[in-house]
């Protein structure tokens, strides 16, 4: 998921972001729209909110492999992923501040460095099982006392 903020009105920027997410994921991204207008956030119902892609099966595993082995190590001052991103339903969410850490992105064509949110939805129904699964997939978590914080 990539939120566009004030750039959501510029069709060229939206198209560039769709191309970037498509390159990163290997699957066509879709535009997300606001469901209702909120004046405090200056949003209008039906306006572009961002871009998302949902990966399953082989494409998901290929993405996780590139994320863990290539993209995350390229993040400047990266110490590991926080374990605070787990919810009570066995899902894990985290953000990346720069989408250019993925090798598929041509740095010369990027108009602006953007962040993205990544959510991993699992069939596990608790934090511990999901944590064990992601550790088995070599996700680099911060090495504080993880076992205490998972309870």
Q: What is the meaning of each model-derived region?
A:
Residues 1-151:
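Ribosome-associated RNA-binding proteins
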